[in-house]
Amino acid sequence: MTDSAIGNVYDPRALPDYDREFIHPDDLRRFENALNDQDVLPLVALNDWRPVYQRVRKTRGRRKEPRRTKDETREGVLYTVLKWPFLAFVLGWISFLGVAYILTRFYIFIYEQWVSWRGKRQSLRKQLYVQTNYRDWLKAAEALDAHLGNHAWKEIDENAYYDHITINKLVSQLRKLRQDAEWEMHHEQVNAAESPAVEELCTILEACVKNNFAGVENPRLYSETYSGTKVLVQEYVDEVKACLELVAESKQISDEDKYHHFKHLDTNFGRTALCLSGGATFAYYHFGVVRALLDNNVLPEIITGTSGGALVAALVATRTDEELKQLLVPALAHRIRACHEGFTTWVRRWWRTGARFDTLEWARQCSWFCRGSTTFREAYERTGRILNVSCVPSDPHSPTILANYLTSPNCVIWSAVLASAAVPGILNPVVLMTKKRDGTLAPYSFGHKWKDGSLRTDIPIKALNLHFNVNFTIVSQVNPHINLFFFSSRGAVGRPVTHRKGRGWRGGFLGSAIEQYIKLDMNKWLRVLRHLELLPRPMGQDWSEIWLQKFSGTVTIWPKTVPSDFYYILSDPTPERLARMIHMGQQSAFPKIQFIKNRLKIEYAIIKGLQQTAPRGGGRATSPTQLRLRNGHGNGPVNPIDERLDQNLPERTGEYSKEADANSAEMSDSSGVDSATASALREARHPRRNSMLVEMQRQSAVFFDDVDSDTWKGQ
């Protein structure tokens, strides 16, 4: 990299819209008014025959409301007597297990450093960590695989983690049918007594294009080498992609039949989503992860973020690819100014308000990353990316919300990002804001307040599957309290075990067994405390969920942190520190790219087939691009953003029309009706041809996420 290029990535003036303040002062003023509005008081009276709001004489002592009521703890003497002794015993045992776990991990670290990584393999391994782009990293990974003899493993079809016999036969069948179909297309000759080869090809594709068919998407198949997977698995992926492209281009099948074919494949195969976890300033590692995926054209269109990850997700979802390539550089640190206040300032604020940071100042700083008061629907129409932000209500018993352009299209993104980052003691709960038809802001969802989504749903996998059929998740996990306990005893994707040619156990079988036992025992006792309602609720929050929820996905990226990150956990990064975090984020994503590429090869081929064959008009859903063209906007040629916009499967969005969305906004904003109620009213005017059970399930589930109930397990 030249000196001018290096200087450019550190120059804040090279950032797009660096000096531009997107948010209007009136938006901040309305947000401040919404925060200061008093909660609506219910009608109260001493009894049925006294007047309401009668003046009541104050008692001398202030009565504290109980943390838990009898509805939760039930009545009983033993609960009161045994609660605190049992809680002390369990917490003491968990502390002992924690110390034992740290010692076990230290033993495994020493074992790997002094037994496994020695000699030439150590020097080749060091080359992986100094590469700045995926091409050079892949060369270094292939050299390490060649030294360890991993290429021989790729050539052998047999493996316990997938059905190699079925895949081998299937590849041969697909290749033969594709060649026959190509011959028929070029010579335009089809035997009248037989069906075209392309129809037989479609039949086989409908049987095999499914999520993790025959185990070909098992992460274990990518966890025994540093680069790539089995040759047979790679041949299968490439052959399926070629067959899908052939079907889309074939003239022997009508567009309507091809559309239904690709729609069926899409339903079975599902979608891919990028999930960015919370973690305070650890979330800046996400910039490097996103940069690595963007540079290699494997950045999914569905993105979800929580807490600090929501800020990164908002930046990604509101910018185009070209803008992101200019923004994801160390100079971005000059725009991260949320923690610039001194010690005395935030101590006084915390003593006065119970929160370290000022909500209005954070709203002003956050608005630049969200391009002002952009809504979820406006971001989707601008970039084609689907942004999701997880928020938790202040009431510990209410369900969480996954805000996106379907559940809350007119919700302002920066308000959702603030709510998702409102950790108790750091930032007070926040009111979500919605944009009305005239462009002004108003409180959303009856003015209820929301807080940090990481407290209950850091990775909202269930809601993503419900709304967008997501069944393949790429999780970038940076929560510091979770990274300590992440341990893959049999290796991870692109990170095989260091000895026995990747077929052994980390730290030996004994070390891995002890680690697993201690970790599972700690998890068991935490669940016991939660189910027996023994844990206190500081600040009105059940803190057990920050340990017991699921934090991983199909592919989990764990950026490597350093001890100084804990010291700067609530501090703005310098350009030099952000440069290191971006580099480490890229390094952690490089081993996963080949796995993600193979997944997206098939997914993008299906989406492209849907785009090419989708009927125009006819009462079907309208994509945002078609909507703009129909209304006289954007009469020029379709650009790549519009092309990607049409690929986001509009058939899942229901009747996507401007009139329907305007009615939804009017009802939600002016009448105080939330989007779920507005959707129900809309459905009453336009009934769908679904069964009663499906319709009731869709209406009840469209707004809420991750309900802890057995009824959701079958979805």
From Swiss-Prot:
Physiological role: Probable lipid hydrolase.
Record family assignment: Belongs to the PLPL family.
Entry keyword annotation includes Transmembrane helix: yes
Active-site residues annotated for this sequence: 307, 452
GO molecular function annotations of the record: triacylglycerol lipase activity
Keyword Hydrolase: yes
Its EC number(s): 3.1.1.-
Domain PNPLA as annotated: residue spans: 274-465
Compositionally biased region (Basic and acidic residues): 652-661
Ranges annotated as spanning the membrane: 84-104
Membrane topology: Single-pass membrane protein
Subcellular location, record wording: Membrane
Database matches in PANTHER family: NEUROPATHY TARGET ESTERASE/SWISS CHEESE D.MELANOGASTER (PTHR14226), TRIACYLGLYCEROL LIPASE PTL2 (PTHR14226:SF66)
Gene Ontology annotations for the cellular component aspect, listed alphabetically: lipid droplet; membrane
Comp. bias intervals (Polar residues): 665-678
PROSITE patterns: PNPLA (PS51635)
Source organism superkingdom: Eukaryota
Organism encoding this protein: Aspergillus terreus (strain NIH 2624 / FGSC A1156)
SUPFAM superfamilies assigned: FabD/lysophospholipase-like (SSF52151)
Region feature (Disordered): 613-715
The name this protein goes by in its record: Patatin-like phospholipase domain-containing protein ATEG_02594
Gene3D superfamilies: Cytosolic phospholipase A2 catalytic domain
One annotated GO biological process: cellular detoxification
Ranges spanned by the short sequence motif GXSXG, renumbered to the chain: 305-309
CDD domains the UniProt entry points to: Pat_PLPL
Matching InterPro entries: Acyl_Trfase/lysoPLipase, NTE, PNPLA_dom, Triacylglycerol_lipase_N
The entry's keywords: Hydrolase, Lipid degradation, Lipid metabolism, Membrane, Transmembrane, Transmembrane helix
